Each structure stands twice: as structure tokens, then as C-alpha cells.
């Protein structure tokens, strides 16, 4: 089962009386974001006790206070992942997909911003992997290669499910 971290956070914001477009969550007070992030991690952890999960999340979020880790240490400890799988594409393709996605509100869709986002995602993933003692895998999701990317992801998840991490 796949659970989207941002969707769980959005549900929690709504329960607090803050109905927000998902791109407005990152504009909230950083302390509030941090608390809701931890609550979301706890909710997802409870879900994971029932069945294996893939948590779809961002490694970082651009907030009004700067870059914020998508999985800060407390969140990482709650989630206790077995692996980190980064799904990447070429910066030009990411920028194109962002421009075509009319459901989202992004400040910029330039390829150079996508390049920076890929770099920051790897930095954050590296930090998480060191803290949690888990591997990082990268799946390329380039234009026309979605089926291959899905199969690569499936193979990694199947292999990860058979490995017992400390």
C-alpha cells in the first residue's frame, strides 16, 4: 500500500480547522508544520503496523523559513524506514511535468530549480540514511520509461521486504 505523507498532513490540518491547498501547507508557521509532520508520522506508523507501506514524501520542503527536511530526525525515528528510494528524472523533464501540472501552485518551474531540488533531495536522503542506517536506491523515471521505473521500484520493494534491518 502507498500512503502520501502530504495527504496525511493535509487531513491533520483540516482536522485542526485549517482547510488548505496542499501547496499552502509549506507556508504555515514552521513550528506548526513540525508538529503536524510528527503527528502524520505517528499516524503512518500505526498504518504500517497493519501492512507494509511505501511512504510517498518529499525529502525537503521549500518553506517561507527556508528548506525544511521532509523527514527530520523525530519523523524518521517514528517512520523507521527500511530503505530510501529516490525517484528521479532529468531536470528538464521535471520542469516540463511541473509546468503541465495545473493542480499545483509552484513558485518556479525552471530546469535549474529542478536540478537544485534533485541535489537537495540527495543531500537529505544521505543524512537520513546515515541516521537510520539504511540504504538509498535511485529509480530513474524518465519520459517514456514509467513502466521500467515501476518495475525497478517493485523489485527494490520486494527485496527490501525480505531484508531484516536492525
Language-model region placement:
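A short acidic, glycine-rich active-site loop
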Residues: 28-35, 108-119
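Class I S-adenosyl-L-methionine
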Residues: 14, 95, 99, 126-133
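ATP-dependent NMP and nucleoside kinases share a basic, alpha-helical "lid"
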Residues: 57-102
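Short, hinge-like loop/turn segments at secondary-structure boundaries
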Residues: 19-23, 102-104, 155-156
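Post-Walker A helix-loop "phosphate-sensing" segment adjacent to the P-loop in P-loop NTPases
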Residues: 1-2
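A solvent-exposed, charged loop/short amphipathic helix patch at secondary-structure junctions
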Residues: 95-115
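ATP-dependent small-molecule kinase phosphotransfer cores
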Residues: 7-69
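NTP-dependent small-molecule kinase module
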Residues: 122-166
Amino acid at each position: 500500500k502507498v500512503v502520501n505523507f502530504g495527504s496525511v498532513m493535509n487531513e491533520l490540518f483540516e482536522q485542526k480547522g485549517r482547510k488548505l491547498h496542499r501547496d499552502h501547507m509549506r507556508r504555515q508557521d514552521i513550528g506548526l508544520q513540525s508538529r503536524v509532520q510528527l503527528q502524520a508520522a505517528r499516524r503512518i506508523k500505526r498504518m504500517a503496523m497493519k501492512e507494509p507501506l511505501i511512504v510517498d514524501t518529499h525529502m525537503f520542503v521549500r518553506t517561507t523559513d527556508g528548506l525544511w527536511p521532509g523527514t527530520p530526525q523525530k519523523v524518521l525515528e517514528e517512520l523507521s524506514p527500511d530503505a530510501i528510494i529516490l525517484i528521479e528524472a532529468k531536470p528538464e523533464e521535471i520542469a516540463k511535468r511541473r509546468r503541465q501540472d495545473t493542480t499545483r501552485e509552484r513558485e518556479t518551474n525552471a530546469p535549474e530549480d529542478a536540478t537544485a531540488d534533485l541535489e537537495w533531495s540527495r543531500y537529505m536522503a544521505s543524512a537520513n540514511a546515515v541516521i537510520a542506517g539504511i540504504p538509498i536506491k535511485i529509480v530513474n523515471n524518465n519520459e517514456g520509461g514509467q513502466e521500467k521505473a515501476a518495475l525497478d521500484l517493485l523489485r527494490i520493494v520486494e527485496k527490501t521486504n525480505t531484508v531484516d534491518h536492525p
